[in-house]
């Protein structure tokens, strides 16, 4: 049975931890508000670019731009994984890493066996995990979320584009956490390259837009912007989802600490009561011995 001193030391440690988790929850909540605003603000612009590409794709042949042209055979795949730089965010990183592993070892198992799967990892946690296990990394961006900027997204998009254009890879897939709500993160995989715009409609394309100088020229300008914007949106979504996961994890840790403190206080009082009872028993026994 633990002594009073042992329980006091443990109580002190749990209370100290509770203060830390409570502070981290408050910091995560403040960061979440900012990250959520940025993610939500990026969605309309990214969506409109995708809509414009969908409309333009009905006016030209996809062969006008190599980033729109699917390959006849997919022999090499690039997986872009977005994780966080820091931990203490529940299952945020573990879940998305498991999803990336399932994608590689199930959907692309045959390609992976032949060395046909390459990765780009954005975020320290994913970089460390896959680098330690010997996965083929074309590039890694640990610490990218320490100072998140559009330039970082553009750098990753440029790297992926060059690999696709050079024929080094035949498909580029994104794996990331999409922000839905504090309690409902959404694990996502989506194809980045070749670009496959959806929702293009010849009727709306001709009635809503006039293209100058030509649809093909506009596509050449829009495609790089689309890729940069999609990577930026994904990183903002992941950042918001990370802060939401951290806030929820720290809230749970704070509540668990509160419950543990309650249990330890009960144990402390019981141990203290037992010690007092023992001392009284010894005093009474000593008094009886003196009388005899």
Swiss-Prot record:
InterPro entries (UniProt xref): ATP_synth_F1_ATPase_gsu (IPR035968), ATP_synth_F1_gsu (IPR000131), ATP_synth_F1_gsu_CS (IPR023632)
Main subcellular location of this protein, as a coarse class: membrane
GO MF annotation: an example: proton-transporting ATP synthase activity, rotational mechanism
Transport listed as a keyword: yes
Keyword entries, A-Z: ATP synthesis, Cell inner membrane, Cell membrane, CF(1), Hydrogen ion transport, Ion transport, Membrane, Transport
Entry similarity comment: Belongs to the ATPase gamma chain family.
Functional description taken from the UniProt entry: Produces ATP from ADP in the presence of a proton gradient across the membrane. The gamma chain is believed to be important in regulating ATPase activity and the flow of protons through the CF(0) complex.
Protein name as it appears in the record: ATP synthase gamma chain
Gene name for this UniProt entry: atpG
């Amino acid at each position: 049975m633990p002594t009073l001193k042992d329980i006091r030391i443990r109580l002190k440690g749990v209370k100290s931890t509770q203060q830390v988790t409570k502070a981290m929850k408050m910091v995560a909540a403040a960061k979440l508000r900012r990250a959520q605003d940025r993610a939500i603000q990026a969605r309309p612009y990214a969506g409109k670019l995708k809509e414009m590409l969908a409309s333009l794709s009905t006016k030209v042949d996809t062969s006008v731009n190599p980033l729109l042209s699917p390959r006849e055979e997919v022999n090499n795949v690039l997986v872009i994984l977005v994780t966080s730089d820091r931990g203490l965010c529940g299952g945020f990183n573990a879940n998305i890493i498991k999803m990336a592993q399932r994608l590689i070892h199930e959907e692309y198992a045959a390609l992976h066996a032949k060395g046909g799967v390459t990765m780009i990892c954005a975020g320290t946690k994913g970089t460390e995990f896959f680098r330690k296990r010997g996965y083929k990394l074309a590039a890694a961006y640990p610490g990218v979320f320490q100072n998140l900027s559009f330039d970082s997204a553009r750098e990753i998009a440029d790297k992926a584009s060059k690999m696709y254009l050079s024929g080094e890879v035949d498909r580029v897939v994104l794996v990331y956490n999409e922000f839905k709500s504090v309690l409902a993160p959404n694990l996502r995989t989506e194809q980045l390259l070749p670009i496959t715009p959806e929702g293009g409609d010849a009727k709306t394309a001709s009635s809503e837009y006039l293209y100058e100088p030509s649809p093909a020229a506009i596509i050449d300008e829009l495609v790089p912007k689309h890729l940069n914007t999609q990577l930026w949106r994904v990183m903002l979504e992941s950042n918001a989802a990370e802060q939401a996961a951290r806030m929820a994890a720290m809230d749970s840790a704070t509540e668990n600490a509160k419950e543990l403190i309650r249990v330890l206080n009960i144990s402390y009082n019981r141990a203290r009561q037992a010690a007092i009872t023992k001392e009284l028993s010894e005093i009474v026994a000593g008094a009886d011995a003196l009388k005899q």
